[in-house]
């Protein structure tokens, strides 16, 4: 299970997740498609998925407890990426409304999002360091760094990095 902050009792999260319906996807099945709206959150029980955006893999997820579809659920919008299974995978399934109804699950998802923001911030710092170290001044890289800075600063977060989900 991903790191659960000390303010959430581990057993409380596990108990709530264990009550959610279980679904299984076979290898190479689409779990979410970008542009669709499912109103569901999936919590990986076992297996592996790839997350792709515009045909580019942005993550492989294998850690039990990882949450998928949380951005769509929290922002009440369509999924922003494609999620596809790499092997037979099991998920606990929750309606998006669970985030409004269950503060423990909401805090769990918030902690996961905070970890991901922390990772993205670290990636930006690393990229900026590489750009400065190698005196890379290409417009594309510069624009990418600037865009990441804008996105992250809009959250009010400090730029730090740590391993995550």
Write out the residue ranges for each language-model feature.
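Short beta-strand segments in beta-sandwich/barrel cores
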Residues: 30, 48-52, 90-91
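Phosphate-/nucleic-acid-contacting segments
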Residues: 133-165
């Amino acid at each position: 299970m991903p790191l659960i902050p000390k303010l959430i009792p581990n057993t409380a999260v596990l108990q709530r997740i264990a009550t959610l319906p279980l679904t299984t996807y076979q290898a190479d099945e689409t779990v979410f498609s970008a542009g669709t709206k499912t109103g569901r959150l999936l919590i990986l029980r076992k297996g592996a998925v790839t997350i792709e955006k515009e045909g580019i893999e942005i993550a492989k997820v294998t850690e039990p407890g990882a949450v998928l579809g949380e951005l769509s659920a929290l922002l009440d919008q369509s999924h922003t990426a494609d999620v596809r299974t790499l092997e037979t995978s099991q998920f606990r399934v929750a309606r998006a409304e669970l985030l409004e109804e269950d503060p423990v699950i909401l805090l769990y998802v918030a902690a996961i999002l905070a970890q991901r923001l922390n990772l993205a911030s670290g990636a930006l710092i690393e990229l900026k360091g590489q750009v400065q170290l190698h005196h890379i001044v290409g417009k594309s890289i510069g624009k990418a760094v600037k865009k990441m800075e804008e996105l992250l600063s809009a959250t009010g977060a400090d730029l730090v990095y740590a391993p995550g989900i």
